[in-house]
Amino acid sequence: MHIAVVGLSHRTAPVEVREKLSIPEQTMEESLQNLRNHEQVLEASILSTCNRLEIYTLVRNPDLGIAAVRDFLSGHSGLESRDLSPHLFTYHHDEAIAHLMRVTAGLDSLVLGEGQILSQVKKMMRLGQEHKSIGPILNRLLTQAVSTGKRVRSETNLSTGAVSVSSAAVELAQLKLGQSRGQDALVTLETEQIAVVGAGRMSRLLLQHLQAKGASGVVLLNRTIERASALATDFPNLPIQCRGLDDLDQCLSTCSLVFTSTAVDDPIIDANRLNALNRRSSLRLIDIGVPRNIASDVHEVSGVESHDVDDLQEVVERNQEARQQVAREAEGLLLEEGRLFLEWWDSLEAVPTINRLRASLEEIRVEELTKALSRMGPDFSARERKVVEALTKGMINKILHTPVTQLRSPQQRSERQQALQVVEKIFDLESGAATQD
């Protein structure tokens, strides 16, 4: 068995490719089931965010298992393998484990140290558990990855001052507005007429950062006004008008800055829509949705500037340099956590022998106990029988404790295999203990 990950991210694929592979939560169960239906895939878990899609698997054969995942991605995205392959990365076992640790710690994020990825990995684990696509191996790996992400954030300063995708989007708006005025600086948003489309987690973060950057008011649009209103109540100091998506054209006509972050299959803003409006001023659109909420043809519309998540790199680079040293400190923690998981993985090699040893001793215990109880006769009470039963079980557990602990303790594989062979021979257990390749 092997752990493997196949995926793509902002580092390997542009947003127009990433959006084709995005897997929304409502189709996650079907996607996980499709993966698990393949004979090579024993466990599967999917991480789908605006900047990455990664599929973690436990497979029988690494080459065949990875090929199955690649076929799934090609079928899901509608992209031919030759078009998709240049954007994919693949990591095997040790590298796959290390990659997940880096991702969860925020070291592989567009925004170094951002905290949202930790919640997204937690969600990946929860969905895998709910849909029964992960078993003991990936469950252990994901649990340790989440623990590692928390540890990195508590034991280093990586999360101090970290920006998120949403805060980077707001800073990008400030930067572009400043540049349009001849200033290479972040300017206040106080005079901008601002709209936010969507009322999910990303929109919540947008409102939080817009308020911090001086926005005097925001129009919040969503399919259901009730959800927008519920979100608005969390920002009593920021004037928010809640509207339905029916008012989107009006907002595009009157606002100077529009952020979009809503779950859609197709863009909700395109050139035809904008050209049909009677606009009198410039419009800046910032789209942090994946799949994209704004079509690429809006660049052709006069007076309109549009940016997507890939354009956030300009802001990110202004914040990254000072954080690189902290990231290097975090790498040491990741190496330690990765080693701990691999030690646990290696210890699984001993499980078949341990199970056979336990079964052999249990068979002896039951046989000898049965003989002893038959000699005690009918005068031996049920309570006394239970006491003797517990006594013999306790003795077996005491006898097994030290050898089992030693067999599963961290050690060189050759040493463990030698110890397993000795146990197999001494106790005359079945040969051919299963091993981890």
Curated annotation (Swiss-Prot):
What are the site positions for Important for activity? 99
The catalytic site is made up of 50 (nucleophile)
Q: Identify the keywords attached in UniProt to this record, alphabetized.
A: Chlorophyll biosynthesis, NADP, Oxidoreductase, Porphyrin biosynthesis
**Positions bound to substrate:** 49-52, 109, 114-116, 120
What is this enzyme's EC?
A: 1.2.1.70
GO MF, one annotated term: glutamyl-tRNA reductase activity
Q: Which domain of life does this protein belong to? A: Bacteria
Q: How does it assemble?
A: Homodimer.
Mind telling me which Pfam families this protein's record contains?
Answer: GlutR_dimer, GlutR_N, Shikimate_DH
One of the GO BP terms on file:
protoporphyrinogen IX biosynthetic process
UniProt keyword NADP, yes or no:
yes
Q: Which gene encodes it?
A: hemA
Task: Provide the domain comment.
Answer: Possesses an unusual extended V-shaped dimeric structure with each monomer consisting of three distinct domains arranged along a curved 'spinal' alpha-helix. The N-terminal catalytic domain specifically recognizes the glutamate moiety of the substrate. The second domain is the NADPH-binding domain, and the third C-terminal domain is responsible for dimerization.
Signal peptide stretch: none
Instruction: Please tell me where NADP(+) binds in this chain.
Output: 198-203
What organism is this sequence from?
Answer: Synechococcus sp. (strain CC9311)
| Record carries keyword Repeat | no
Specify the taxonomic lineage. Bacteria, Bacillati, Cyanobacteriota, Cyanophyceae, Synechococcales
Please share what else the UniProt entry notes about this protein.
During catalysis, the active site Cys acts as a nucleophile attacking the alpha-carbonyl group of tRNA-bound glutamate with the formation of a thioester intermediate between enzyme and glutamate, and the concomitant release of tRNA(Glu). The thioester intermediate is finally reduced by direct hydride transfer from NADPH, to form the product GSA.
**Under which pathway is this protein filed?**
Porphyrin-containing compound metabolism; protoporphyrin-IX biosynthesis; 5-aminolevulinate from L-glutamyl-tRNA(Glu): step 1/2; Porphyrin-containing compound metabolism; chlorophyll biosynthesis
The UniProt entry, under NCBIfam families, shows:
hemA, PRK00045.1-3
Q: What is the name of the protein in this document?
A: Glutamyl-tRNA reductase
Known InterPro entries for this protein? 4pyrrol_synth_GluRdtase (IPR000343), 4pyrrol_synth_GluRdtase_dimer (IPR015896), 4pyrrol_synth_GluRdtase_N (IPR015895), GluRdtase_CS (IPR018214), GluRdtase_dimer_dom_sf (IPR036453), GluRdtase_N_sf (IPR036343), NAD(P)-bd_dom_sf (IPR036291), Shikm_DH/Glu-tRNA_Rdtase (IPR006151)
Which family, according to UniProt? Belongs to the glutamyl-tRNA reductase family.
